[in-house]
Amino acid sequence: MTSRKRLVFSYCCLALLLAMLFAVSLFWGSVALTPQAVLAALTGRGQDALSVGIITQLRLPRAVMAVLLGAALSAAGYLLQTFFANPIAGPFVMGISSGAKLAVALVMVLFLNYGLLTSSAVLILAAFAGAMAAMAFVLAAARRVQRMSILVICGVMIGYICSAITEFVVAFAQDSSIVNLHNWSQGSFSGMTWGNVRTAALVVLPALAAAFCLAKPMAAYQMGEAYARSVGVDVRRFSRLLVLLSSLLAACVTAFAGPISFVGIAVPHLVKQLLGSARPLYVLPGCCLGGAAFCLLCDLIARSLFAPMELSISCLLYTSPSPRDS
């Protein structure tokens, strides 16, 4: 099979898998619905108010969010692996998700303690600030160390420090804050609303579009900084954009679904193996499709395995051997 045919075949397989999982997620759950009932609800011809509400207000926004956030997390992992030239770099390993988790935890505890409501925009801003702070520490360490293995250790250490501070914050939180924070910190796509979908789409889609625009400079950067400069890439500006985009994508995922590990590390490697190519122009779309399908599958298993009881995403991913947060 030629490389072009392999790419087309791989994209078709990923798109078909994503479409199948999306469809199954709409009619499979604690309340079983037939495909006919799902189609009727989606086209506005549903007669049963209960089934229409389950589809349009619960399962559909949840599935859309799983697609958006799965694509964002996988793309963030690939951007970080490209930037650090390290195959195990990812939002969790580099401490970005832990920094975002700490910032969101602080906002949730402080706001709930004073009886204030936390909007999606506030959580995203807090998560982005925490992610950028953690990334700043990693970049500061990168200037002082030469070996990538030491840099990864620095990222892991920052992650553990952020997790320790998060636990310290929780120790002084009110009971209601602890419950909300615990449920969120396990990682889940439950409780998503159309308002969440709109906010996430406003963040994720432009960030992914910007990442696609950087595909050509990324290909040059993979050949080394010297080569990238020789072909006209502003490495400093490019690096800043890469850091901002990866942090923003990881922060958005953490703000809405909590800290989710493994996806940002594993999916880019699986996609590259499937496509037989490491070119960013080909890998980025594959990462988005693969990450979306992977998160849909995990969410489907989490809410269906022991229905009506629902598992967290982390409960499933922690069974996989991968670098992860505490």
PLM segments and residue spans:
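Alpha-helical transmembrane segments in inner-membrane proteins
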Residues: 1-326
